[in-house]
Amino acid sequence: MANEEQGSILKALDVAKTQWYHVTAVVVSGMGFFTDSYDLFVISLITKLLGRIYYQVPGSSSPGSLPDGISAAVSGVAFAGTFIGQIFFGCLGDKLGRKRVYGLTLLIMTICSICSGLSLGRDPKTVMVTLCFFRFWLGFGIGGDYPLSATIMSEYSNKRTRGAFIAAVFGMQGIGILAAGAVSLLVSAVFESKFPSRAYILDGAASTVPQADYVWRIILMVGALPALLTYYWRMKMPETARYTALVSKNAEQAALDMTKVLNVDIEASAAKNDQARVSSDEFGLFSMKFLRRHGLHLLGTASTWFLLDIAFYSQNLFQKDIFTTIGWLPSAKTMNAIQELYMIAKAQTIIACCSTVPGYFFTVGFIDYMGRKKIQIMGFAMMTIFMLSLAIPYHHWTLPANRIGFVVLYSFTFFFSNFGPNATTFIVPAEIFPARIRSTCHGISAASGKAGAMVGSFGFSALVKALGMSNTLYIMAGINLLGLLLTFTIPETNGKSLEELSGETEPEKIKEKIVV
């Protein structure tokens, strides 16, 4: 039996039951994040291999390694591209619409993933320059996926489960990290079985077989597959009803799009004077009215994301160095080039399975019950505690009998970053800003995070060399504590509609007839 009710498009979105389309949107948007994290984190697995292939010094007592500057560039150049892409595509998503630029980011990621693996030349300089060039543009495409995926998912979702939906999209980052390790394990195992060689300590020249040059290229190019496979479905997604109604001022089209995907019949009857009232309340980005309403919120989302990413990316990108320092990974001399890649990938995969991935999905399960702010405070607090637990008795953890304990505590920092601020810093900016600048503000917040990632990727190894691992861990603990304090500048968004949070429209401003 059909019941006729007066309501709004926006209210219909907020009260809509979870349907198959929501699940489809999570998968399609999430596969972009799967690709993002695979491409960003896989580089940390292959840098040791690149050093052996291109920077081996004949007769040296230790395997070749990338020079510090080149290592930092290879690890961090994608973040520079991501930083620019987040701001550029964030603004474009508000100007042109979410859908119109959503497919472009995926195409850039696909093309540049392939080109990264096809980096030109054989001499070290040429290979590194072309690799960095394509990884910069890969990062540019990845950057666009952050504000667009978050904004699209928040605008599609109902208010009851919105946090879980956005967290599920972001949770694909964990699956991407896991996949990066798994693919590296598989490729290195296959090549090791087909092209075995002796450990470096036994035969330095022969420990890196010529075929190793194919290994890192294949691993990088695999990142193009998930992006390519979901391109068609991403282009089939309609523009979000919130953007169409509130920004494009086309209530009829918004009603039509909603009718197709959410199983409700809507007759749009929004009058022009209603839409004019919405427009009259508009204010520009960084206007005085924006700063009064949302200035502190933007400061909070940007600063907490910046601090989180310093710790998160330095931990991820340099965990191989940390594990080598404490002796959890064997000495590089005792392995050939492909075996070393295998062992690094194995360590990352274990950490991903035991702490990284579970953390993401704890967030999915609890965020709409606990709220965003509590989870973020808890995450920063626990990361601070575990970092101090590693730093204070650092010498204790370096003893052979205690190394597993170090790895366990280190894993907990990953768990609480993902069941904590790594997820919530992505979610909150997609909820608290008006629709007409939502994508831009999310892009600014995310770009602030990537600035932190660049600080982490370029600065972590320098800090360790200058201050030692123990003092560096103290600094990371301090960064997490500061992130906890700045969390109090953001509002709790749990259980509230996007329009209630942004204050951009009243329920009666856009009226439709809904038949359920």
Curated annotation (Swiss-Prot):
Q: Which residues lie on this side of the membrane: Cytoplasmic?
A: 2-25, 93-100, 154-162, 234-293, 371-374, 425-442, 493-516
Q: Where's it found, cell-wise? A: Membrane
Q: Which InterPro entries match?
A: MFS_dom (IPR020846), MFS_sugar_transport-like (IPR005828), MFS_trans_sf (IPR036259), Phos_permease (IPR004738), Sugar_transporter_CS (IPR005829)
Q: Name one GO molecular function term.
A: phosphate transmembrane transporter activity
Q: Identify one Gene Ontology CC term for this UniProt entry.
A: membrane
Q: Which residues cross the membrane?
A: 26-46, 72-92, 101-121, 133-153, 163-183, 213-233, 294-314, 350-370, 375-395, 404-424, 443-463, 472-492
Q: How does it sit in the membrane?
A: Multi-pass membrane protein
| GO terms under biological process | phosphate ion transport
List all topological domains (Extracellular).
47-71, 122-132, 184-212, 315-349, 396-403, 464-471
**Modified residues annotated as N-acetylalanine in this record:** A2
Summarize tissue expression.
Expressed in anthers, tapetumand mature pollen and, to a lower extent, in hydathodes and vascular tissues of cotyledons of flowering plants.
SUPFAM superfamilies per the UniProt record, alphabetical: MFS general substrate transporter (SSF103473)
Sorted keywords for this record are: Acetylation, Membrane, Phosphate transport, Symport, Transmembrane, Transmembrane helix, Transport
> What's one Pfam family here?
Sugar_tr
Write out the similarity annotation. Belongs to the major facilitator superfamily. Phosphate:H(+) symporter (TC 2.A.1.9) family.
Q: What else is known?
A: Although related to the sugar transporter family, it does not transport sugars.
Explain the purpose of this protein.
High-affinity transporter for external inorganic phosphate.
User: Protein name, please?
Assistant: Probable inorganic phosphate transporter 1-6
The record lists the organism as Arabidopsis thaliana (Mouse-ear cress)
For this protein's source organism, the top of the classification is: Eukaryota, Viridiplantae, Streptophyta, Embryophyta, Tracheophyta
Q: Which gene encodes it?
A: PHT1-6
